[in-house]
Amino acid sequence: MYLARDCPSPKWGASILVAMKIAAPWLLAAAAGLALALAMPGPGLTLSAILFPGLLLEAIERAPGRWRPGFLGWIAGTVFWVVTTNWVIPVMHDHGGLPQLAAVGCLLGMGAYLGVLWGFAAGLAAALPSGWRIWLFPVALIALGVLPRFPPYGFTWTGIASAFIDWPWLAASLPVWGATGLGWSVVAIGAGLWGLIRTETRIAGASALVVAGIALGVAILMSPAVVPTGEPVTVAAIQPGTSLEEKWDPSQSRAIAERVWSMTAAAAVQGADLVLWPESAIPYNLENDATYREMVESYARELDVEIVLN
C-alpha cells in the first residue's frame, strides 16, 4: 500500500535544490582546476585543457557578487596546483623527513599561494558583462600567469602550453609567439566555446573562437622551418635513472656520480661532442663546490666534450 507519508517532503526536495544551487559554483570551480591539471604531462588528458575556462566562467556566472568570483578563481587555481604538484608530499615526507600532515600542509599552502593569481584573474573578468568576460579572462589569466616566473614565486612549471608538448604541430608555433601566445589561444578557445553554448553570449563566443583560431593558424603557418646551419654536432643526452630514494641517500652519492661519469665517458667514445646531464644528475652543487666543479671541467677537457648541466 502506498501512503502519502512515504512521499518525500516538498520542503526536503526544495532544500536539496537550494543546497545544490549554492554548491554548484564551487564544484564547477574545483572541476575547472582539476580539468587543467589532468591535461598536464603525466595524466595527459590534453583536451581537458579546453574545458577548464568554460567551467570557471560558468562558476563565475552562477555566483555573481563582489568577492565570490575571486574566491572561485582561487579555489580553481588551488585545486590545479595541488593536483599538479602532488609530488611535494613524498619529497617533503619521505625524503625531507617532515611528518605526513606537515607535508600535506606544505602542498596545500603552496597551492593556495599560487592559486591567488587565478583569483585575481577571475575577479577582474567578473567585473565585466558575460560577453566581454570571454575576452578579458584569457588575457588576465595568461598575463597574471607570467608572474610566477619572478620573485617572490620563482615557480616556472606547468604553464598551460605544456599540456600540448606532445602535439608537434602546435609546439611548432612556439618560436612565433611563445608559450604565452599558445596558452592564450587555448584559454580563448575554451572561453569561446563556453560563450557559444549560451544564448546571450553566442556572438561573443563565436567571435572569440574565430579570433583565437585565426591567431593560432597564423602562428603555425609562420613557424620557421627547421634548416640545418653550421657543422653537425653529435649530442648525447644521458639518463642515469636515479630514483628519489637514491638521490636522498648520502651513501649513494659516490655511486650516482660514478654512474654519470661512466655514461659520459661512453658517450665520448661513441663520438659525442656535447653531453647533456639532466637536472640534479649528480648529488653535488657545482655552484658552491669549486673543487668538484674543477673536476667536471677537467674531465670534460680530458674527454674533449662539452658538458651541459640541467
Model-derived regions: residue spans:
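Short, Lys/Arg-enriched N-terminal segments with co-localized hydrophobic residues
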Residues: 11-19
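Membrane-embedded alpha-helical bundles of multi-pass enzymes
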Residues: 20-224, 274
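Soluble catalytic regions of membrane-associated enzymes that act on cell-envelope
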Residues: 222-310
